[in-house]
């Protein structure tokens, strides 16, 4: 695995890590990571066979198409949620949207990514420290600084589902892309800034 220590040791990264950032360093750090990870996520989504969009590993699991469509829309959805100081919790029991095709999933990903790229730079570091709450029945399910909210619910949430999709691909007999190291099917990819 190749890592970019230059970026990890950059002045902007040090300011973000120490909590002494100014301007929109937090948004830029999140956006830099998002842009790098977008390529890998797209690679995973492109591998889903059209004929397997309705496949699921278990009755309680999302179909491959539902999972992929969710992954495509997480970036814009979470970014939108982060703009308000308080939002109602989504209905976790609502039916998941089905994807009609891999092309539809990739188009949704492109639109979602465009929204993130347009919106994140408008959130300055002061706003990144403000609290975002997700509330259900008068109780805060989530109460985090906006930057932490975005890190957790946009990026970490995305990686969680990408890992799920990797298992789906393996069980479908599809070659799994490398991510941070070899996948069993591919050597590690090179990570760069």
Where are these regions (language model features)?
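Solvent-exposed, charged/polar functional surfaces in cytosolic regulatory/catalytic domains
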Residues: 40-43, 47, 111, 115-122, ...
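Helix-adjacent hinge/juxtasegments
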Residues: 80-124
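Short, contiguous alpha-helical
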Residues: 2-7, 12, 31-45, 52-95, ...
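Acidic catalytic patch
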Residues: 122-138
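Short, charged, low-complexity loops and linkers
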Residues: 18-32
């Amino acid at each position: 695995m190749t890592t970019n220590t230059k970026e990890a040791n950059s002045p902007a990264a040090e300011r973000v890590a120490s909590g002494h950032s100014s301007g929109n360093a937090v948004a830029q750090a999140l956006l830099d990571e998002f842009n790098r990870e977008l390529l890998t996520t797209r690679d995973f989504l492109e591998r889903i066979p059209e004929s397997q969009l309705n496949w699921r590993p278990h009755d309680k699991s999302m179909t491959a198409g539902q999972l992929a469509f969710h992954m495509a829309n997480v970036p814009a959805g979470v970014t939108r949620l982060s703009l308000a100081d308080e939002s109602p919790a989504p209905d976790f029991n609502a039916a998941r949207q089905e994807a009609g095709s891999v092309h539809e999933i990739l188009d949704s990903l492109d639109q979602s990514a465009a929204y993130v790229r347009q919106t994140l730079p408008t959130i300055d570091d002061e706003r990144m420290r403000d609290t975002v709450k997700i509330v259900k029945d008068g109780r805060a399910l989530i109460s985090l600084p906006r930057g932490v909210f975005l890190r957790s619910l946009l990026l970490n949430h995305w990686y969680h589902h990408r890992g799920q999709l990797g298992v789906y691909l393996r069980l479908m007999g599809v070659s799994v892309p490398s991510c941070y190291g070899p996948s069993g099917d591919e050597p590690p990819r090179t990570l760069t800034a």
